[in-house]
Design a protein with these regions (language model features):
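Amphipathic cytosolic juxtamembrane alpha-helices at the membrane-cytosol interface
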Residues: 247, 251-266
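Membrane transport/envelope proteins' first extracytoplasmic loop
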Residues: 1-225, 234, 253-254, 267, ...
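Conserved G/P- and acidic residue-centered "switch" motifs that form tight phosphate/ATP-binding loops
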Residues: 96, 250, 275
Length: 281
C-alpha cells in the first residue's frame, strides 16, 4: 500500500472549479507560495442500465494517479470501458460483458484499480463507501468528450514540488494552496490527500487490523502459557509419589524437570514452526 504512492504518483490533493481554468489561470495557481504541478483530472458521473449504480468516468491518466490493470486491458476503441475490479465483482460483471453507461452501450475490456480510489467513496463527506452502487472507470478520450459537458466536473489534481514532511506540514501547505486558488478562480471542492478517504481508508483499515491481530496474538500466548502452567502443576501434584520414588532412585531435579517439560515444549516448538511456515507462505 505505502509503495503505491510513489509507484502510481498519487496526487497531493485535488480541487474542483466552477469553470474550466485556462492556461494562464493554471500557471498562476502553480506559481503560488507553495509551488505545485496541476493536472487535469476531469470526470463524468453517469447512471448505468444493467445494474442500479452510478459510474464515474475518467480519461486514461498517465502522469498522475496512474492506473493498475488487474485483468484484461485498457479501452482502445470508443465503445469500450475498463471498470473498477471491486465494483465489477460486486455487480457480477466481467471482461467481455456489456454495460450501458448513460446512453451508450460499452464493452468491458478490463478490470482496473484507480490509485486515488482504493476505497470507492463518491463523496468525501460520505460515512462509508459503496462499491455496489458506485464505481469508477476509464474510457478513451474521444468517448469521454462525446458525452458532452452536461455532467462534466472540472476537477484538477496537484502535486507539490516539495513533499511535506508530515500531515501537520501538509495541512499548512494545503491551506496556503486553497487560499491562493480561491483568489484566482471559483472553488467548489478542495480535498488534500491526507484527508481523502478514497485514498487513505484502505491503509488505515489495514493498520487497524494489524494492531488488533497483534494484540490478539499476545493474548493467545498469555492464555496458552497459563493453560500449560496449570496443566503442568496439576500433573506434578498428581505424580508427587512417583517423583519422590524417582528422586530416591537417584534421578536429579534437572532430569525430572526435562522429563515433565519435554512434551509441552515439543508441542510449542512444532506449533511455532508450522505456524510460521503457513504464515509466511
Amino acid at each position: 500500500y505505502d509503495e503505491s504512492f510513489e509507484k502510481y504518483n498519487i496526487e497531493s490533493g485535488n480541487f474542483e472549479l466552477l469553470q474550466k481554468a485556462d492556461d494562464d489561470a493554471i500557471k498562476k495557481i502553480e506559481d503560488g507560495e507553495e509551488k505545485i504541478k496541476v493536472y487535469e483530472n476531469f470526470y463524468l458521473d453517469k447512471e448505468t442500465k444493467e445494474v442500479d449504480s452510478t459510474i464515474r468516468l475518467f480519461k486514461n491518466r498517465k502522469d498522475i494517479d496512474r492506473i493498475c490493470i488487474m485483468d484484461g486491458e485498457l479501452p482502445s476503441a470508443d465503445d469500450e470501458i475498463a471498470i473498477d475490479r471491486m465494483y465489477a465483482d460486486n455487480n457480477k460483471l466481467k471482461v467481455g460483458d456489456s454495460l450501458t453507461v448513460g446512453d451508450k452501450k460499452l464493452k468491458i475490456t478490463g478490470l482496473v484499480a484507480l490509485s486515488d480510489y482504493s476505497a470507492l467513496y463518491s463523496n468525501p463527506s460520505d460515512m462509508m463507501f459503496d462499491a455496489l452502487k458506485f464505481g469508477v472507470a476509464i474510457v478513451t478520450d474521444t468517448l469521454f468528450d462525446d458525452y458532452g459537458e452536461a455532467d462534466l466536473h472540472y476537477s484538477y489534481s496537484w502535486k507539490y514540488d516539495k513533499t511535506p514532511a508530515d500531515d501537520e506540514e501538509a495541512q499548512d501547505m494545503a491551506e496556503k494552496v486553497m487560499k491562493h486558488i480561491n483568489g484566482i478562480s471559483m472553488l467548489t471542492q478542495f480535498i488534500p490527500e491526507y484527508s481523502n478517504q478514497a485514498i487513505h481508508f484502505t491503509g488505515d483499515d489495514i493498520e487497524g487490523d494489524n494492531t488488533m491481530i497483534t494484540v490478539f496474538l499476545y493474548l493467545v500466548m498469555v492464555i496458552i502459557a497459563f493453560v500449560f502452567a496449570i496443566t503442568t502443576g496439576n500433573t506434578i501434584a498428581k505424580e508427587a509419589n512417583v517423583i519422590g520414588t524417582l528422586r530416591a532412585s537417584g534421578y536429579t531435579k534437572g532430569e525430572l524437570v526435562r522429563h515433565y517439560l519435554a512434551t509441552p515444549m515439543i508441542v510449542v516448538l512444532v506449533s511455532a514452526i508450522v505456524g510460521n511456515i503457513l504464515g509466511y507462505t
